[in-house]
Amino acid sequence: MKIKFSFKAKKEFINSAKFYEGRVVGLGKRFKQEIRNQLDLIQHNPKSAELKYKDIRVLVIKTFAFTIHYKIEKEYIVIVAIFHSSRNPEKLR
């Protein structure tokens, strides 16, 4: 299955990578690579993450304390949000 990003998720991904890169040179690159690694896992085994909400699965990324929120559609896996665990998940709805 192919992966698609919602506009919001893509923006969160880019902004988070920039934030980490601004903190420590190279950390943004490590963040992006970790997200890509997790997206590969999702792509190869879409049902591996916990079904948390009605149709949204959540994969926890412990290295950076982020979660990837996604849903499985007919032809795509849609990344709905890439969310830092310190944020209120109610804002996703």
Where in this protein do the model-derived segments appear?
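Enriched for short, Lys/Arg-rich terminal
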Residues: 29, 61, 67, 71-93
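Basic, Lys/Arg-enriched alpha-helical interface segments
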Residues: 2-56, 76
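Short gly/ser/thr-rich secondary-structure transition/capping motifs
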Residues: 51, 61-62
